[in-house]
Every structure is written in C-alpha cells, then in structure tokens.
C-alpha cells in the first residue's frame, strides 16, 4: 500500500529540516563559545596544583599560568624543586618549552602535542589550548541530560576538515544554569572512548563561573587519573603581549 503525503506538507518538511539542523549547529556553537568565555575570559592568571595518580604512586606538580584570548599562553613550573623553572609558551599555533637545566628553548612539533604533559594524563595540547573547541570543531546540540544533578546541554563536537585535531569526536555536557562544561568525553577516530574529564567545585570569580577542580580519567588505565586544583584565579587582567615571548619565558618568576 502506497502512502501519499500532501504536497504542501512535503514542501514544509523539506524547508524546515535543514533549518532545524542549522539551528542545532548554531545553538551548539553559541553554547560552547559562552562556556569557553565564561571559564577563560579575555585574559587570566591561575595558580595550579596537579596531582598525578597511579596505582602504585602519586606525585604533584605546581605551576602558574597566564593566558590572553585564545592565542597566547604561558606556563611556569614552581614545583617540585627538580622541575622548577621550566616554562611553556604558546603563541597562536606555535608552542615552545624552556629548560633552565640545559638553557635551551625547544619548539614543540605538532607530533608531540598529544604527549603526556609532565607525565600526566593531560597532553601539551590540553594544557596550552593549542587547538580551539570553538574554531577547530563543528558543533551539534544533541539535546539535554542530567549530570551530577545538573541539567546540561549535550553537544557533539567533530573536527573540521583540515583542522590539526587528533580526536575523532568530543562530547560535552554544559550546565544550563552556569554555562560550565561539567563533563567532556574524548573519542578517537574509531569512536572509542579515550578519556573523560569531570569539572567540579564551581566558584563565582569576577562575575564568572569557574570549576576549581578538574579530574581527567583515562578509559584504559584502571586506577589512574590526574586531578587539577586551581587557586588564586584572576580574570580580565591587563596582560601585554610582551610576556608571551621566548625572551620572557626564560626569566619568568
């Protein structure tokens, strides 16, 4: 038995469907943009403790970080003593490291951006934000779900053609009331879950909502995770581009 649709209904369906798809993309991107601006600001300064947890050992790394927009970033290691003084610089899409032990500045190639940073589950790309979840991905609003008691937007991010991104897909859950990405899942190109990041202890600082604790849990390493705790967070502070230079990264304190 054939089923016939009225011609007007079919035309309306063909018009509305693309509009709904574009609206879902636009809404997804605007939510991600607001969440990024909310947690990063135009500029920022933070002091951080990073705890690397493994089944048989735990160690901590302390560092300071400065950022300006999404183009500039500087990280300075303050502890432990044997690693103190190392610094990492991001300018646009280029990243360098400085080691006082060998007194050398080394440019980090794209192939090393996914290596574990300071032995943690975070990568160089994660810490220095070399890739942008706003500019390097497409965004699709999948719907709403509840995470840890918070009603969230669920958004699918896929890398744009030509973007230097290793992930096949990200899923982000952004809280509706505070616009904070409370959960992020990272998938490889085969669609397998690689790691999950959980954000908690959300605080209001300078009028913006910011998680003061992040947990990154690898999917294939039982008993392993990296916990980041932020303190002394400042946003929208005056930062000149002169601090984001190879010369300054060698003398930052």
Task: Please report, for each region that a protein language model flagged, where it lies by residue.
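Bacterial N-terminal signal peptides that target proteins for export
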Residues: 1-11
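Short, exposed beta-strand/loop patches in secreted or surface proteins that constitute
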Residues: 63-67, 87-88, 142, 200-202
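Short, mixed charged/polar active-site loops
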Residues: 57-62, 83-87, 105, 169, ...
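Bacterial N-terminal signal peptides
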Residues: 11-20
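Gly/Pro-enriched, hydrophobic low-complexity segments
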Residues: 128, 148-246
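Flexible, processing/modification-adjacent segments and terminal tails
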Residues: 25-43, 49, 58-59, 87, ...
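N-terminal, post-signal-peptide region of Sec/Tat-exported proteins
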Residues: 47-82
């Amino acid at each position: 038995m054939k089923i016939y649709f009225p011609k007007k209904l079919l035309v309306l369906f063909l018009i509305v469907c693309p509009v709904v798809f574009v609206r879902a993309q636009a809404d997804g991107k605007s939510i991600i943009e607001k969440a990024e601006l909310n947690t990063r600001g135009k500029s920022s300064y933070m002091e951080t403790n990073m705890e690397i947890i493994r089944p048989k050992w735990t160690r901590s790394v302390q560092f300071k970080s400065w950022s300006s927009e999404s183009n500039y970033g500087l990280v300075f290691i303050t502890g432990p003593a044997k690693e103190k003084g190392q610094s990492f610089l991001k300018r646009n899409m280029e990243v360098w490291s400085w080691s006082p032990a060998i007194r050398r500045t080394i440019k980090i190639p794209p192939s090393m951006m996914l290596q574990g940073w300071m032995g943690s589950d975070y990568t160089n790309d994660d810490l220095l934000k070399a890739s942008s979840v706003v500019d390097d991905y497409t965004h699709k609003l999948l719907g709403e779900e509840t995470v840890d008691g918070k009603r969230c937007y669920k958004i699918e991010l896929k890398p744009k053609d030509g973007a230097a991104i290793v992930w096949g897909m990200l899923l982000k859950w952004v809280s509706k009331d505070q616009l904070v990405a409370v959960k992020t899942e990272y998938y490889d190109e085969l669609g397998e879950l690689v790691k999950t990041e959980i954000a908690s202890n959300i605080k209001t600082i300078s009028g913006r909502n910011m998680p003061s604790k992040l947990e990154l849990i690898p999917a294939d390493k039982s008993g392993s995770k990296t916990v980041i705790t932020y303190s002394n967070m400042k946003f929208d502070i005056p930062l000149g581009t002169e601090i984001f230079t190879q010369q300054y990264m060698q003398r930052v304190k």
